Amino acid sequence: IARHMPFRIAAKNRYENDARARKVWDLCVRTLRYGAQEQIQDCMEREKGYYLGDGCYSMLAWCLLNGDFAPMRKFIDDFLRTSFINGGLVTCANCSFMQEIAEYPLMMFVLLPVLEERGDSREFVRERLGDFRKILDFYRENYAGDDGLLSNLDKWCVVEWPSQWRDGYDV
């Protein structure tokens, strides 16, 4: 027996007639259908909270597939609520695990235009713009270099490319 949030496919699979592409589509749909239980988690066996960075893309795909954007609004609010711990937000919400990854809160901005396009979410976005400005202010005040890039990070930074791919970027 499997339990999951209500999930109806609203998106069209344009590769319906391609057997290989259909397998990938089906895998992705099943992963999102059964992996989202009120929130997005990387690994159901070991993680007790959910990650902001991975959750942004999983939540976006989940909402676009089924047309229900209520979980995305909950996702955003859950992470905005962590600002009392750190103005740049924490990486993992709804749990006691304290972790900060610089890029993750900034990735959440990708969700705003998607919600803004939906007539029923415009007010939600407008009401939270001040909170999003505070995130930008936090990173500008604490980590912005003269070139506009994040620098002097004292937290984990996902963007730690191998030296041969850095193009002179100092991690």
Q: Language-model features: where?
A:
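Alpha-helical support elements that line or immediately flank enzyme active sites
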Residues: 52-82, 112-120
